[in-house]
């Protein structure tokens, strides 16, 4: 049976159609009220992105959802997890740094009007096991224990491309976004018994080049970064003691992308499918009936919000999608992105990508060219949703209702009445005419196009 996906496009002709309030109406249409009881704890799962990336979820969008939950008499809480320990540095790998980043992006208790849980602890070691009974690859994953305290979960996602997941949406925001550190490693196959990190092989040629750099150099960083002392320089060679490796993943990205170590291609090619497996495990553990999904298809970039930068949007803004089915809501976004025109000059404005229905994220986002349909098909296989959907175009909220949220006065108590004494005491005398009757610059000179560009140059030319 086809799942319902509720949708509103990117246009706005009055306040009720503004982006923050689209999700409010769509959540109502999708039946959020039936999922929320007064006094319940409602988790709002977000991903704020890394510092430097501004094509991410807006605080205003999330705040509107927070206020809708509060109007229902429930207790909203923003929930997020720390980044996996898979690099020497990073914005969100420990709670202190993560909170610093979300503050920079406008997410804190004051701006959101509710608590923010960065689940759980500095490195999310307090987690629970989530069985994946029908996983394509995974047998189980892990989610922070604090997630089990939630009565309802609104998963709010920015839809975009992804280097490893091929695309990021609702499924990934659970499969990775609600996984603990161990869960994230499992999803990336980093602790796989055959293909995991301990199977990595040192590229000695690259290592020798790196060791020639002045100290402290990259090799020093890799050695110091391993909490289990797996790396060393012995007899002039860079050595990986795999028998010491505990698959913590701290070395993965720096050694992979630098070419210092070679890992099985399976680590990359299985990621989208494992994301869906992990999503299924976490949803089954917490209760599938607790979930509802909001996908914002705006600022659709070729790469993920995990990056500390963002490229130009590859597709024009499409709109807001809401469903109780994570597979269907992602499928609706994928098909809308496949049907849309691409933005001129963007990464997708290229042969093989610009044409509709060309599997754009497969060929334009995924590092390993993994199909964008893997998450969808694996989600169906895991029983968390359906790829077939009915797209229901919703009607906006009334401008009157939205206005009542924006301002705390109305026609019965207008601002002139409320602040009568203060207004009457204000000094309105302009101390003479503020303008002349005839313009000093004739109208024909005001409207003509002025001289513009004289020369194109680069900063290197000046240097």
Please report, for each region that a protein language model flagged, where it lies by residue:
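Extended, low-polarity segments enriched in aliphatic/aromatic residues
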Residues: 2-46, 51-61, 67-68, 72-79, ...
